[in-house]
Amino acid sequence: MAAPIRFFELNTGAKLPCVGLGTYAMVATAIEQAIKIGYRHIDCASIYGNEKEIGGVLKKLIGDGFVKREELFITSKLWSNDHLPEDVPKALEKTLQDLQIDYVDLYLIHWPASLKKESLMPTPEMLTKPDITSTWKAMEALYDSGKARAIGVSNFSSKKLTDLLNVARVTPAVNQVECHPVWQQQGLHELCKSKGVHLSGYSPLGSQSKGEVRLKVLQNPIVTEVAEKLGKTTAQVALRWGLQTGHSVLPKSSSGARLKENLDVFDWSIPEDLFTKFSNIPQEKFCRATEFAHETHGFYKTIEELWDGEI
């Protein structure tokens, strides 16, 4: 039996379960299973295309009395073709309808990159100049309305986060980014901590959709060594590293056994002598998002510009 999920406190005072469930490419049955196992933070996004399915699960489990809405922490994300201020509230309204809830606990700008309204997926001709300041003001209005209990960003570099902090009336509660032992984001961590922004790590075990990437994390020699010494799986060690580093983690799995395993990270810790070994792991970013950069059509001409060199 997994220990109760612990929390990180956001700058709004809200408590964010420190192990959440990533829902990209997840089916309803797996999400229902995860909630029944004990997951309470569900990380959604409109672009994932499954918010209606998730909404059906939420309605069923809340209606059956298995879980109360206030016990769940639901995150969703604004897609890049809805960045115009007039489109932001419409996008959240669609998400709320699909999820069959009255509010989200956290709403994020998914990428600091914009697409033309008629485009869903990023192609060179559909890339357009982002105006994050205007988009953020619309996000702040959603926060004021209570339909988004907290607002934040995703995939923002240190520079982009700093630029936003310089103009924001409401400080972002979260910056959700790729983070795992092979991409530790130390500089971004320090910035977020100094500004009261919680860092949340997606792909904490590497990307499930890219097997070779997952292996680079879970078969890393240092991660493997620590797991063997502690009698834990490499996945548990990677997740526990994240929690001890100070960020929430968003693993995803459709396997009941793995879902339980990923929650079993609370009643033990990585000793300091082993924890320091993680600083010796060579760093490599896996999610590069090359589709948001283009030398002719893109606002970001290169991925170095997209990530401001943090790549």
UniProtKB/Swiss-Prot annotation:
Organism domain of life: Eukaryota
Protein name: Aldo-keto reductase family 4 member C8
Keyword annotations from UniProtKB, A to Z: Acetylation, Detoxification, NADP, Oxidoreductase, Stress response
Stated role: Oxidoreductase acting on a broad range of substrates: reduces ketosteroids, aromatic aldehydes, ketones, sugars and other aliphatic aldehydes, and oxidizes hydroxysteroids. May function as detoxifiying enzyme by reducing a range of toxic aldehydes and ketones produced during stress.
Lineage: Eukaryota, Viridiplantae, Streptophyta, Embryophyta, Tracheophyta
GO terms classed as biological process: response to cold; response to salt stress; response to toxic substance; response to water deprivation
Matching PANTHER family: ALDO/KETO REDUCTASE
A GO MF term: steroid dehydrogenase activity
EC number: 1.1.1.-
Organism (species): Arabidopsis thaliana
